[in-house]
Regions:
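ATP-dependent carboxylate/acyl-activation modules
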Residues: 1-151
Length: 151
């Protein structure tokens, strides 16, 4: 889209918001790229009172709520832990490419687990972190939604 098209779209969004909530103060509008659908996974961290930060991996989106098919490790993790977390979920065949679906980039998912583990080590103030969903593709992965809670 051109700069003029973006400006016109911004004006429409602001006008619509003010129509629905006349007293609203609007400081800006978030614009982000729409990503193509991929295999949905979740990566999360919670703090256990006894063990400290615990990393979670599983199928994402609504599947995590329905299937509760997740793996956990205490932070920090190493490459072997990341590989095992991915391979031990029941949904692993989906990540390998099931019934004609493209396989997910397992190396990128392992790297993402390791990066989240390192991030949590470097930022002990993070109480919770959720990347859900992460779209896994044959050649990469991208977090589409994220939530971080700071203590």
């Amino acid at each position: 889209a051109s700069a003029d098209e973006v400006g016109a779209a911004f004006d429409r969004v602001v006008a619509s918001a003010k129509q629905h909530v006349p007293g609203a103060t609007i400081d800006g509008v978030a614009v982000q790229r729409m990503e193509k659908q991929g295999t949905e996974v979740i990566i999360g961290v919670t703090k256990d009172p006894q063990f400290g930060p615990v990393l979670m991996f599983g199928l994402g989106g609504v599947l995590v709520e329905v299937l509760k098919d997740v793996a956990f490790r205490i932070v920090p993790i190493v490459e072997r832990d990341a590989r095992q977390m991915i391979e031990e979920i029941k949904g692993y065949p989906l990540l390998q490419g099931y019934r004609g679906q493209e396989a997910a980039d397992l190396g990128k998912l392992r790297a993402l687990l390791l990066q989240v583990s390192s991030f949590i080590e470097a930022h002990p103030e993070v109480a919770e972190l959720d990347l859900n969903p992460v779209f896994a593709y044959k050649d990469g992965a991208i977090a589409v939604d994220a939530r971080i809670v700071i203590e």
